[in-house]
Regions:
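Conserved phosphate-binding elements of NTP-dependent enzyme cores
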Residues: 1-951
């Protein structure tokens, strides 16, 4: 039947070679192949792009301007396509207000639950809060000092969009004269033109009163009118004081603490009704950190102990400090740590009213001659951060600030009213701070009254289902309050995956990009179960994946190859896992069948006998652990998801080393002491951040080979005849570049009802240089032709020039031979950017005392790429360096010299060292989940090596 298959004819996106592919519908399908072979081109740039385009094209032009328009992919036809949803690796959100709870929409159900069955408890005296009668309201007003002026208001519209014309007509009919709109008093006879797209608050002025003893009946009438019109709410707006909120619903009878109407937005930290007024719902506040301002307390003030005031381009602040210290009698030649507390306070927070005379003349002759109070370095940094209009200055000042938990809401983000409402004895903030596994237990064990249970039953079902989905994709260690911007790409993707499982859609084409990233093998089994559950709902799942377990669990595999870039783009094999394993020309098949495998190292390196030791590491879930990192070895940190690997390596070790070696101002996570840093000279963090943020940044510029290539072109006879220097061949400066596109090679065209379109420059046709520059050639190729070469092609082209060939060869060695030298950095994936950084390290002179840190470098890599990567890492270690990586991939784990396994579980159940030693030693530790999965792999590979034919 035609409708049980997706049939693709003539796919040519990027490097795809006009391929035809047939994919079964309603199955779990894995697309695999070498890095750069064309997997994503087939899955995302062909299938997803066309599925999305067809859906968007069915909508109106008005809707399309918001959804964006996708270009038709380069394909002849696709039949049997469903609406497509892409679940990729992009981080969820950089917004500090976005949390796991808001992204998964579980917060919406929590807010609804607390609003409907929550019980307000007074935070002052612990008394249950009950509704207020009119008599209680009148009593409260009469307790105010005599002659206090106030007005009684009835809030009839609160934070609602619209023009509200009917509301104003109703107020007129009721006979009221004044109304307060968005905080301003107006006469009801005025003409109101409210913006219908903005939220408005409208309150009727019921009465204006001066408090005196004989006014009870008037107050009674006013409150009754206010409550009748607003549905039970009234405001006493005290002139010159705080307004008093009244409600027929909830107020403390002892202290008068009022909660107001229990509605979902009261429990939202993104709404003014619920947000903490101090941190505005962020849970954190930026404060200047003394440890960042004075990073080395052994220095004197004269030696530059105050980091923000060290001279960069001006002597203004050093001179001001010098004159202030002379006149305030603070010694500048004493180490900061030995200064008296009073002197330290003066240096940090100012002279507390004492003035000093300051005389300063700048380089341009400008003179400042004043008597002033000494501001103090911390106050100075804080003021400059908040007052400056310069992004540069703000970024510089931000380096000396740290995020501290808000002391008003204690990090819960909500105001006192929201946090006073309890369900099961806990407020919503406390429950959101539980790990998802424990939160699920809380709701499973929740005991409610019979009436509350009837209301809460459907809400609880949704909450439990969504929490279960998150647990089943290996995220039980996360909390709903965790900021979305701190999630890894893999975590963000699995959160979206859990959200999609919860939607229970069927007939959808889901396209996923390596969902196994960041998952331990134990958690991966659960993930595969979740993928199968989505398939069984009647969906087609297309997963771009290299994980062997996922491939073996798939119904169908499509292997793209044989190589990467121009050497890829063909279907090497397609069929069930068993069929692909029998394919002779499929590299994936050879790894699945065991004909090809990554061998165990012949010996484990003993290292150089030195180590870096961290004691008392206690950041996040780390349990005061002491860890030794041996030097001169290939060290891998393992553990189940959420066990504390990233916290230990990235938050503690990396920041400690960066602070000591690079004078980095980023504050390390909690630890007691560190030793052994003198044994290394340089920290190199090879992460997945972009190598550049503009189209002009590319592999050639990043690796430094472009300088050598420009030198070469400047030495040609034609360049010498024309007087062209090296700068002529740069697209960053005027002269040789195309000025129509400023050397970008592309132009951005803004469209009204369509997304911005990028088109090749009509003058240089995307070549980035002007015609005169392109007339200079080396071996028949101009500079633009060279930038269009892949790294592999360029190695052959520049074979006679060792300086260039050596740098290019490192790109090939790390599996980036398919990348073009001029490929914009903005188009490189995180894994490609990471390997680009690795390549640039390989061609540098090795001191043998470098410390390399990599976080999951196997992201996006096929087994063949991983084999190559291990070879590159071995080269760095063989040169005497230390390589430390966080990794789950067992091929990498088995190749390590030394393992540090954290766990045993994720979240609160982790943070301890379960095992350390060689892979063989860890494999024998029964408590180690890593060891349990590693042991059979070691046994399998020993057996393979014993039967493998001699080379």
């Amino acid at each position: 039947m035609a409708n049980d298959k997706i049939v693709i004819h003539g796919a040519r996106a990027h490097n795809l070679k006009d391929i035809d592919v047939t994919i079964p519908r309603d199955k779990l399908v894995v697309i695999t192949g070498l890095s750069g072979s064309g997997k994503s081109s087939l899955a995302f740039d062909t299938l997803y792009a066309e599925g999305q385009r067809r859906y968007v094209e069915s909508l109106s032009a008005y809707a399309r301007q918001f959804l964006g328009q996708m270009q038709k992919p380069d394909v002849d036809s696709i039949d049997g396509l469903s609406p497509a949803i892409s679940i990729d690796q992009k981080t969820t959100s950089k917004n500090p207000r976005s949390t796991v709870g808001t992204v998964t929409e579980i917060n919406d159900y929590l807010r609804l639950l607390w609003a409907r069955v929550g019980e307000p408890i007074c935070p002052n005296d612990g008394t249950p809060i009950a509704s207020q009668t009119v008599e209680q309201m009148v009593d409260r007003i009469q307790k105010l000092p005599e002659r206090t002026k106030l007005q009684i208001l009835s809030p009839i519209v609160r934070q609602k969009k619209g023009e509200h014309k009917k509301i104003f007509e109703k107020i007129k009919r009721e006979g009221f004269v004044r109304v307060r709109v968005d905080g301003d008093i107006h006469d009801i006879s005025e003409t109101f033109e409210l913006n219908k797209n903005q939220q408005h608050t409208i309150e009727i002025v019921i009465d204006r009163i001066v408090v005196k003893s004989g006014d009870r009946s008037r107050l009674f009438d006013s409150f009754e009118a206010a409550l009748r019109l607003s549905g039970g709410y009234a405001i006493a707006d005290v002139i010159g004081g705080e307004p008093i909120m009244f409600s027929e619903h909830y107020a403390c009878p002892i202290c008068g603490f009022t909660v107001g109407e229990l509605e979902p937005r009261l429990f939202s930290f993104n709404a003014p009704q619920g947000a903490c007024p101090d941190c505005e719902g962020l849970g954190i506040k930026l404060e200047v950190d003394e440890d960042l301002v004075v990073p080395d307390k052994s220095l004197t003030l004269a030696e530059g102990a105050l980091a923000p005031w060290n001279p960069i381009s001006s002597q203004y602040y050093p001179e001001m400090l010098k004159q202030a210290c002379e006149q305030l009698e603070i010694p500048m030649d004493v180490p900061y740590e030995d200064l008296s507390k009073a002197d330290q306070q003066t240096v940090l927070y100012g002279s507390n009213g004492k003035t000093f005379h300051f005389h300063y003349q700048n380089d341009f002759g400008g003179v400042r001659d004043v008597d002033a109070m000494f501001e103090g370095v911390i106050n100075n940094v804080d003021r400059r951060y908040h007052e400056t209009n310069s992004d540069f200055t703000r970024d510089v000042m931000r380096k000396y600030m740290t995020e501290l938990t808000c002391q008003t809401c204690h990090g819960f983000r909500l105001n006192r009213k929201a946090l006073s409402v309890k369900v099961g004895g806990e407020h919503i903030g406390m429950v959101s701070d539980l790990a998802i596994g424990k939160e699920l237990d809380f709701f499973n064990e929740l005991s409610l009254s019979e009436q509350s249970l009837v209301i809460a039953k459907p809400i609880l079902k949704e909450i439990r289902d969504r929490l279960s989905f998150l647990q089943n994709v290996g995220l039980a260690y996360l909390t709903l309050s965790r900021s979305a911007r701190t999630l890894s790409g893999g975590e963000a993707q699995r959160i979206r995956l859990a959200t999609q499982i919860g939607s229970n859609l069927s007939g959808v084409l889901y396209i996923l990009d390596e969902p196994s990233i960041g998952l331990h093998q134990r958690d991966n089994d659960r993930l595969i179960g979740s993928l199968k559950k989505m398939r069984d709902l009647g969906n087609t799942l297309i997963v771009v994946e290299h994980d062997e377990d996922t491939m073996r669990a798939a119904d169908y595999i499509v292997d793209i190859g044989p190589g990467a870039g121009e050497n890829g783009g063909e279907v090497m094999a397609a069929g069930t896992p068993k069929q692909v394993a029998r394919s002779r020309k499929s590299l994936t098949g050879q790894y699945l069948s065991g004909k090809r495998f990554i061998p165990l190292p012949e010996t484990r390196r003993p290292g150089n006998g030195k180590k870096i030791r961290i004691t008392g590491a206690a950041e996040n879930n780390l349990k005061q652990i002491d860890v030794d990192f041996p030097l001169g070895e290939f060290v891998v940190v393992t553990g189940v998801s959420g066990s504390g690997k990233s916290t230990l390596v990235n938050d503690v070790l990396k920041r400690v080393l960066a602070q000591k070696l690079n004078r980095n101002s980023e504050k390390p996570g909690k630890y007691k002491s560190v030793s052994g840093i003198k044994n290394i000279e340089r920290l190199v963090n090879i992460d997945q951040s972009p190598i550049g943020r503009t189209p002009r940044s590319n592999p050639a510029t990043y690796t430094g080979v472009f300088d050598n290539i420009r030198d070469l072109f400047a030495q040609t006879n034609e360049a010498k005849l024309r007087g062209y220097k090296k700068g002529r061949f740069s697209f960053n400066t005027k002269g040789g570049r195309c000025e129509a596109c400023h050397g970008d090679g592309i132009l951005k065209i803004e469209m009204n009802f369509l997304p911005d379109v990028f088109v090749p420059c009509e003058v240089c046709h995307g070549k980035q240089y002007n015609s005169e520059t392109l007339e200079v050639e080396y071996k028949g190729k101009n500079i633009a032709d060279v930038l269009q070469m892949t790294a592999s092609e360029a190695v052959k082209f520049f074979e006679p020039i060792p300086k260039i060939r050596r740098k290019l060869q490192t790109l090939v060695d790390v599996g980036l031979g398919y990348v073009k030298l001029g490929q914009p950095a903005t188009t490189l994936s995180g894994g490609e950017a990471q390997r680009m950084k690795l390549a640039s390290e390989l061609h540098k002179q090795q001191s043998g005392k470098n410390f390399y840190i990599l976080d999951e470098p196997t992201t996006g890599l096929h087994s063949e790429d991983i084999r190559r990567l291990i070879g590159v890492l071995d080269r760095l270690v063989d040169a005497g360096n230390t390589v430390l990586i966080i990794e789950h991939n067992l091929d990498v784990v088995k190749s390590a010299d030394y393992l540090i396994d954290l766990g045993p579980e994720g979240g609160d159940g982790g943070g301890t060292i379960v095992a350390t030693g060689t892979p063989e030693q860890v494999a024998e530790v029964a408590e180690s989940y890593t060891g349990q999965y590693l042991k059979p792999v070691l046994e399998r590979d020993r057996a393979r090596e014993a039967t493998a034919p001699a080379k």
